[in-house]
Structures are given as C-alpha cells and as structure tokens.
Design a protein with these regions (language model features):
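Active-site capping/gating regions of soluble enzymes
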Residues: 169-176
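Conserved Radical SAM active-site core
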Residues: 1-4, 11-158, 162-169
Length: 176
C-alpha cells in the first residue's frame, strides 16, 4: 500500500483495492526473460511509495542491480526517482538507469496541497536539482576520464497531471 493518499492515483492509501507487488528478483527475472525473447527493449520502473521513499528506492536499486550486474542487461532503463529519498540512493539509481524522472505531480503548490496533501513542492524539486547536477558532473568527468561511470546518460524528464485542478496547461508549462 502506498503511504501517500493522492486523490488522482489508483494506488492511494485510501483506495480499498487488492494490492500486489513484485520482489526485485521477480521483476528482474521477468524483465530479462522478456528482453531475451525480444518482447521488450527496456524497462520503465516506477513504484508506489511502499513504507518510505528510501525503502522504495532501495527496492528499485536492487532490481536494477540484478538486471545490470547479475544478468548483464544492456537494454534501456527509465526509472522514477522518489522525492524524499536519501540523495545517495538517488545517485545510485542514476548510475544504474539510462534516464531518471521525477513527477512534478500538479501545476501549483495549491493544487498539490488539495489533491496530494502529503507531498511538498520542495521535496519534489530537490531530486530534480540533484539529478541535473549529477548529470553535469558526470559529463565533465567523462570528458576527463573516458571510463568514468555515466549518470542517467539519456537525461532527465518529468511529467505532471493537467486538468485535475483549476490551473491551465500554460501555468503548468511555466512551472516545469
């Protein structure tokens, strides 16, 4: 069960639905099996926040470590960074993924407070700033040292929900 109660999300804590979750090994096994059969070319990894942002990020890191280091997975990986997670965990996630993203969620702090009251704007923008810095640092290191590890080499992206509140798309675009 997700620890957040975002009104727009099916996984919200107040939604009384049966829940299911893959273990890191189950997800890695399923991914590598589909990849070897040419059913998929990559993985988009996102998650509800289970227990805490750190715990959830650690599960994601375990999954990607199994794929990259144990199974030799060379396909594309896009992972969602979890706001509130320890920056060291976000850094580790970015060394395993090709692209990282963070959901802005909603176009304003007002709509965030209304529809996702447990989430805070600053907590959302902190990992976005960290990812930007890590990407710039990684590029500089790779110019000096050819074999320096890459950080999210395909970059960073974001998304937001438009239409769940009174804000316009223009306001949302300015925010991002």
């Amino acid at each position: 069960v997700c620890v957040y109660d975002c009104q727009y999300c099916v996984n919200r804590t107040s939604n009384d639905l049966p829940r299911a979750m893959f273990t890191p090994r189950e997800l890695a096994d399923l991914t590598i099996d589909f990849y070897r059969r040419n059913y998929i070319e990559g993985l988009f990894l996102s998650s509800a926040v289970v227990h805490s942002p750190d715990y959830t990020t650690e599960l994601m890191i375990r999954t990607l470590t199994l794929l990259r280091e144990d199974y030799g997975f060379s396909g594309y990986i896009h992972a969602k960074a979890i706001p509130g997670a320890d920056p060291l965990l976000t850094a580790r996630l970015g060394r395993l993924a090709d692209r990282l993203s963070v959901n802005i969620e909603l176009p304003s702090s007002k709509s965030l407070a209304l529809l996702a009251p447990d989430k805070k704007t600053d907590a959302i923008f902190q990992p976005m700033a960290q990812i930007k810095q890590e990407i710039l640092q990684s590029k500089a290191e790779r110019q000096k040292f050819r074999h320096a590890p890459a950080f999210a080499p395909a970059g960073q992206s974001t998304q937001m929900i438009v239409g769940a509140s009174d804000e316009t798309e223009v306001g949302g675009a300015k925010r991002s």
